């Protein structure tokens, strides 16, 4: 989740080893070898999900919805456990924010909401919505829900882009 600091390795090490040592002593068993997979703290910032804006719809007196060409099949975290994410319109980085918008996925599910009430410049069909902080769990948790295809992956390094996984097809 963007903005939420990942717990440090030393935080985890202290919390886990203290309990393991105590329990091993209590049960008179030898200490095991401990290996920690730091996950999010290493790769979360390495991934940015890019979506194309479709329809922008106003529900009078309620809110504005921005539909995108992805959703809960490629980023389940907001629907599954309420992960909070940020986003920008990549092609309007210098434009002034004009209001709050709710980013809705393409699946016909009431829970397919990526971000609620985010301040953005005026979104229009064809704009590119960039969601940072997607490197840790979006790809491993992606599914083929509702017959959707898993997304392509592009590696960008030193100003050069390379397709490293094609989008799925039939």
Give the positions of each predicted feature.
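Active-site-proximal beta-alpha loop/turn segments in soluble metabolic enzymes
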Residues: 1-9, 38-42
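Charged (often Lys/Glu-rich) extended helix/loop segments that serve as interaction or gating elements
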Residues: 15, 29-170
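Alpha-helix-loop-beta-strand connector modules within alpha/beta enzyme cores
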Residues: 12-24
């Amino acid at each position: 989740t963007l903005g939420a600091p990942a717990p440090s390795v030393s935080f985890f090490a202290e919390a886990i080893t203290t309990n393991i040592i105590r329990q091993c002593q209590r049960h008179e068993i030898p200490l095991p070898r401990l290996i920690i997979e730091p996950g999010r703290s290493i790769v979360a910032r390495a991934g940015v999900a890019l979506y194309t804006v479709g329809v922008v719809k106003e529900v009078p007196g309620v809110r504005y919805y921005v539909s995108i060409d992805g959703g809960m099949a490629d980023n389940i975290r907001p629907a599954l456990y309420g992960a909070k994410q940020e986003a920008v319109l990549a092609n309007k980085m210098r434009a002034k924010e004009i209001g709050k918008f709710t980013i809705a996925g393409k699946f016909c599910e009431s829970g397919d909401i990526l971000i609620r009430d985010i301040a953005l410049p005026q979104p229009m069909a064809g704009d590119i919505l960039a969601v940072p902080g997607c490197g840790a769990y979006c790809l491993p948790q992606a599914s083929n829900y509702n017959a959707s295809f898993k997304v392509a992956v592009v590696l960008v390094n030193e100003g050069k882009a390379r397709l490293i996984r094609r989008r799925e097809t039939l």
